[in-house]
């Protein structure tokens, strides 16, 4: 019982002290509160410049000056300019190499295409040259053989039909015959195998085609064998020489 009374008294004392503190706080005047707030505002206003000055000092200590920054920018710009010039030089070199390679490839393509065309033409030419003697034999047979009976005419028409098919096939391949009669002799087209003295045609005129020549496209496939006009020999000097001994 004694202990419980002590605890009750102690609790009452604490409550009394709390009440006194509250009354002291409530008894403070509004003017005093206003003064305290003004003092806090002044303190904060004074502290702000101090912080700004401190920040500025820190920036100057940890950063670079304007001159150093400008020098660094100038150096970086110079380095970038040098890199750009170097890249431009490399680009020009690569472009030149590309153009050279492209030109070489185009020349190679044209050369191989021309070689292929020449090879194809040579194969075609050799094949057609093997067929031309057959055409010559057909033409000789047509000019020399004169069918007399109906059976001979039938045979003549049959092989002439084969001849016509062969000639048509050669035309489709680009083969065309020469027509040299009456033209001036051209060693690039004709081969002179005979000369006939005559005063009816100028010297060097082709009088007759003995073996027909052919073109393959615009090229000579086979030269034409021809007879060429020659100047007629004058017999007057020989007659005078023969009459001179008789006079003596």
UniProtKB/Swiss-Prot annotation:
Pfam family, one: GrpE
InterPro entries for the chain: GrpE, GrpE_coiled_coil, GrpE_head
Record-given protein name: Protein GrpE
Location of the region described as Disordered in the Swiss-Prot/TrEMBL record: 229-248
Stated family: Belongs to the GrpE family.
Gene3D superfamilies in UniProt: 3.90.20.20, Head domain of nucleotide exchange factor GrpE
The keyword Secreted is annotated on this UniProt entry: no
Biased composition (Polar residues): 238-248
Record organism: Trichormus variabilis (strain ATCC 29413 / PCC 7937) (Anabaena variabilis)
Single GO cellular component term: cytoplasm
């Amino acid at each position: 019982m004694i202990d419980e009374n002590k605890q009750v008294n102690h609790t009452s004392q604490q409550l009394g002290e709390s009440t006194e503190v509250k009354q002291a706080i409530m008894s403070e005047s509004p003017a005093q509160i206003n003064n305290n707030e003004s003092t806090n505002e002044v303190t904060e206003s004074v502290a702000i410049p101090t912080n700004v000055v401190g920040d500025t000092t820190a920036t100057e200590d940890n950063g670079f000056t304007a001159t150093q920054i400008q020098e660094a920018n100038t150096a970086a710009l110079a380095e970038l300019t040098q890199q750009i010039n170097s890249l431009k030089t490399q680009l020009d070199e690569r472009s030149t190499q590309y153009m050279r390679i492209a030109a070489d490839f185009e020349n190679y393509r044209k050369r191989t295409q021309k070689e292929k065309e020449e090879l194809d033409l040579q194969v075609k030419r050799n094949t057609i040259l093997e067929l031309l003697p057959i055409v010559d034999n057909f033409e000789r047979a047509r000019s020399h053989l004169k069918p007399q009976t109906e059976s001979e005419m039938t045979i003549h028409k049959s092989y002439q039909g084969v001849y016509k098919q062969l000639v048509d096939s050669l035309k489709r391949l680009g083969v065309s015959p020469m027509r040299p009669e009456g033209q001036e002799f051209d060693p690039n087209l004709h081969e002179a195998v005979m000369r006939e003295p005559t005063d009816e045609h100028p010297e060097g005129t082709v009088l007759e085609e003995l073996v027909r020549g052919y073109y393959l496209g615009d090229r000579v496939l086979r030269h034409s064998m021809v007879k060429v006009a020659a100047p007629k020999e004058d017999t007057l000097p020989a007659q005078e020489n023969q009459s001179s001994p008789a006079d003596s």
